[in-house]
Amino acid sequence: MSIREDRNQDATIYLGNLDEKVTDSILFELCLQAGPVVNIHIPRDRVRNSHNGFGFCEFLHEQDVEYACQILNQVKLFGKPIRVNRASQDRGVNTLIGANLFVGNLDPLVDERVLYDTFSALGQLVKAPQVARDENGRSKGYGFVSYDSFETADAAIEAMNNQFLMNKPITVSYAFKREGKGERHGDIAERKLAAAAKKNKVAVTPQSTLPPGFSPATPAPTSAANTPATIAATSIPPVPNVPLVGATTAVPPLSIPNVLPFTAAQHFPGMPAMPMMNVPMGPGGAPLVPPPPPGMVMASPSPAAATIPGAPVMPNIPFYQTINAQNGYSQQQRR
C-alpha cells in the first residue's frame, strides 16, 4: 500500500518505533483489530528498501482512531512497544514548532545517518532527518532537519551554514512552508505560537527514530589527558599493595609447615674458620686426599695463593696431571 494525496487526516493514525521486521501486511492485521482499514503506508528507503521506523494507517471511520490509540498504543511488535497517536496531532506539532531547516549542496555520500550525527550534536531533533532522493534512490543534493525549538535551530544555522560536510560547503536555512507562498519557517508568527505552547507547558517529543541499523556516533573524548584516567578506572583491575624491594616496611617470614627454619652459620670467638667445602677430614683436622687415578700423578699446590696478603687459608686441594706414556710429556689438566 502507498500513501494517497486525498488521505483523510482525521481518520489516520501514526505508528512509531516500529521494528525493521514490521511489514505492511503485519501492520494491516494489527490495525484491523480497531476497525476497517482503508490504507497502510510505511515510508521506505529506495536504496536499502528498509523503512524509517514509522508508518500510517487510515481507517474508514474517524471514530475508530480514538479506539485504535487506546488499544494499540504500547503494544509490542517483535519486542518493541509501538507508539500510536493521531496523525493530525503529529501534523499539528510540526506546524506549531516550525523549526524546520533546509540543508542544501549536500555531497552524494551524505545520507540520513550523516545528517543525524552532524545536527543531533547541536540539539534535540523531533524526527529523523530526510534526504531528498529521485526514483532511483540517488540523492538530490538537499535534505531537511527539524529541531524542537527555534533557539536550537538558530544556533544550528549559525554554526553549520557554509561549513564543509563531505568536502562540500553546505547551506543551512529555514525551509519554505508547504502551504505558504514563498514564506519560510521561523517567522514571528511561528515563534509566538511556539512561545505560547512553551508557556502552556505543551511537551514536544520526537515523533520518529532513525532508520533501522543507524545509531548516533559515540562522542570522542574531549581531550587526551582524561583518556588514561578513564581506562584505568574502567578496564584495569586494582593492583594489590606489594612492598617494593628495599622498602623499610618489614615483611613477615613465610610460614611453611613441617620445614625447619634456615639459620645462617654462626662464628664463635676462639674457633678457627671452617672451610665451606665438601672435603672429608682425617685425624687432626687434616683433609683426606684420595689416591690419584691410574695414569696420573699428584702435582704440587700453586704457591700463588699463599703470597696474597689477607687471603683466607684454603686447604690443599690436590691437582692431578696426566702422564703421556708414549713420549714422557705431561699435559696439565684444565682447571
UniProtKB/Swiss-Prot annotation:
This is Spliceosome-associated protein 49. Signal peptide: none annotated. GO terms for cellular component: cytosol; nucleus; precatalytic spliceosome; U2 snRNP; U2-type prespliceosome. Gene3D superfamilies: 3.30.70.330. It comes from Schizosaccharomyces pombe (strain 972 / ATCC 24843). GO terms for biological process: mRNA cis splicing, via spliceosome; mRNA splicing, via spliceosome. Residues 13-84, 101-172 form the RRM domain. Its main location: nucleus.
